[in-house]
Design a protein with these regions (language model features):
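Acidic/histidine-rich alpha-helical segments that form the ligand environment
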Residues: 90-133, 145-157
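Short, contiguous alpha-helical
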Residues: 2-9, 17-36, 40-92, 133-187
Length: 187
């Protein structure tokens, strides 16, 4: 196998920005592989008393991508479809509302959010490194760095890729740490 068989792998000896973006993309790819190719039943399957579903995770992570790379990065609003959701309850409404979306809508929502995030990150990195300050700030005015946003998103994907691993195994037995060589989404 060659490096081109696993394009989602971070570089062996890259810059800090390349490693952060690479680690994030590896988790994104693994998550997408775990969620890929399912119908509505598979995307809505639950384990035990948990309300988590792969469909809910697709929608949640799409929202997190948009929130980090708009609101937190630049202070801009997220826009559609997030501006029409009633926020403020005990749980994230995107988890429950995913049951109303088709598999095609959920996959497209996540895929487009990730594409937007990659474009926004590339534009941001063209103007500086991970230490540049972003819009997100504490109440006393201390601003977060781009590094912090990337680490937060890596943490979010790490948590939910683990959830996706368990959910997918329960749906159809798919197991594994990494997608197969040259994998691309099928749905």
């Amino acid at each position: 196998m060659t490096d081109s068989d696993y394009p989602w792998e971070p570089p062996l000896a890259g810059t800090e920005a390349e490693h952060l973006a690479g680690a994030l993309d590896r988790l994104r790819t693994t998550f997408r592989w775990k969620a890929d190719g399912l119908d509505s039943t598979g995307l809505q399957a639950r384990l035990g008393v948990s309300e988590l579903t792969l469909g809910g995770l697709l929608k949640h992570l799409a929202r997190v991508e948009d929130e980090i790379f708009t609101v937190k990065l630049t202070g801009e609003p997220m826009g559609a479809p997030w501006d029409s959701i009633a926020w403020g309850g005990e749980t994230d409404p995107e988890f429950a509302s995913a049951a109303d979306d088709s598999p095609e809508q959920l996959y497209a929502l996540w895929d487009h959010a990730v594409a937007r995030s990659r474009d926004r990150l590339a534009a941001c990195l063209a103007n500086g490194g991970p230490d540049q300050l972003v819009h997100l700030a504490t109440r006393d005015g201390r601003q977060a760095s781009l590094r912090r946003l990337l680490c937060d998103l890596i943490e979010e994907y790490g948590r939910h890729t683990g959830h996706a691993d368990l959910l997918r195994e329960a749906v159809d037995g798919r197991v594994g740490e990494d997608p197969p060589p040259r994998w691309t989404p099928q749905s």
